[in-house]
Regions:
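A residue-level marker of the well-folded mature domains of exported/periplasmic proteins
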Residues: 3-5, 13, 20-308
Length: 308
């Protein structure tokens, strides 16, 4: 009888835990909902949330706008969601709202882009400095002789992109490369502007050895990006094209000859892990403060594997 009673208690406890998890709502906040990169984080979030029995709410600014991101985060705090994962557009701007969430006993983590000076409890995403280094290493592999380069970033206050720039500079400047005047340019995650800036770099510096962004924004304006590459390769067939990320449009660009190498992140993995980490935090469990998602190097030799 005692064993039966204990078994019944255990079953009730398990059912109670499952019911509690089913009621939990976790917010995933991207820098901008117009960025296809974050669609994969959303998909990973939704799939994992269904698997573990929680709800993933995906909402962010329509486009890259740090002030709007802060307001959306504030709204989630007011609504009393059970946890928040945010890809931080401006590391300084979120410090206050993250503290408010923590004061309200709402777990907060960052994904993709960190704010390590805030009260966030964990980060899940790329080692961005290493990604910058890898971009540089791939360029040097294609063009061993030191030359000149221009680079492009998204928002100047994005910690992840600044880390990526630092890694790129470490790799290239350490190997004797020189950055051209006007670099880096900042596109604020705007694909059309990003493609135009690449063209502008080439127009102003027709002898530049390479133009190597730290984000793949330009490839999401395919026609404009293809026009840029076609213009360059009419005169410079040997210009190496090393691009970040490996979303389907970028993989197809590589397959079609509009890139030589892609250094890809794993945004779906970030979205999924964000749900797992928030659930653990909500249950009072310990989590690792830094959770690194890996990188993938894609070339013409293995692109078909990634396109499947």
């Amino acid at each position: 009888m005692k064993k039966l009673f204990l078994g019944a208690v255990s079953a009730v406890a398990l059912l109670g835990g499952a019911a509690q998890a089913a009621d939990m709502k976790f917010a995933l906040i991207p820098k901008g909902m117009d960025n296809p990169y974050f669609d994969l984080s959303r998909d990973g979030c939704m799939e994992e949330a269904k698997k573990i029995g929680v709800t993933c709410i995906y909402k962010g600014p329509a486009t890259h706008e740090p002030a709007t991101e802060v307001q959306i985060t504030q709204d989630f705090v007011t609504q009393g969601v059970d946890g928040i994962a945010i890809s931080v557009a401006d590391a300084d701007s979120v410090i206050g709202v993250i503290k408010q969430a923590r004061d309200a006993n709402i777990p907060v983590i960052t994904f993709d882009a960190d704010a390590d000076k805030s009260a966030r409890q964990a980060y899940v995403g790329t080692d961005n400095k290493e990604m910058g280094r890898e971009l540089g290493r791939q360029l040097i592999k294609l063009h061993p002789k030191a030359g000149t380069f221009a680079t492009q970033s998204g928002g100047p206050a994005a910690a992840n992109l600044n880390d990526r720039l630092a890694g790129l500079y470490e790799a290239l400047k350490g190997a004797g490369w020189t950055e051209v005047k006007g670099s880096p340019a900042f596109c604020n995650d705007d694909a059309a502007l990003a493609a135009q800036q690449l063209t502008d770099f080439y127009t102003a510096n027709p002898d530049v050895t390479a133009i190597i962004p730290v984000g793949g924004w330009a490839l999401f304006a395919p026609k404009a990006y293809q026009n840029f590459v076609n213009t360059v390769r009419e005169k410079r067939k040997d210009m190496p094209l090393v691009m970040p990320d490996d979303l389907p449009v970028e993989l197809q660009a590589l397959k079609d000859g509009y890139a030589d190498v892609l250094v890809g992140q794993r945004p779906a993995e970030m979205g999924a892990k964000a749900m797992d980490i928030l659930l653990k935090l909500k249950k009072g469990e310990k989590v690792d403060p830094v959770n690194i998602a890996g990188l993938d190097v894609v070339t013409k030799d293995n692109v078909d594997k990634f396109l499947k």
